[in-house]
Amino acid sequence: MSTAQARHILVGSEEECRILKARIDAGADFAEIAKEHSLCPSGAYGGDLGEFSPGQMVKEFNDVCFNEEIGVVHGPVKTTFGYHLIEVTDRTD
């Protein structure tokens, strides 16, 4: 069974998401940005969501985690929760 591991940053606006992504792309630490800005409780852990299986996350989030490149920050990804930056850290098939 497939699994993925990821970390994310959840914010309320696409603009804020883009600004934070630019900071990360420029070398800012993902975990520190998550701790400072994420609306998700996982922000306290650097955005780490641990391991999960297909279908455990909302569709838009799931699609990134099980189809996109590992080790790259993806986003903004819009879900019913807000806007995410997602980094898939591992995946098994």
Q: What label would you give each PLM region?
A:
Residues 16, 57, 84:
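Short phosphate-engaging motifs
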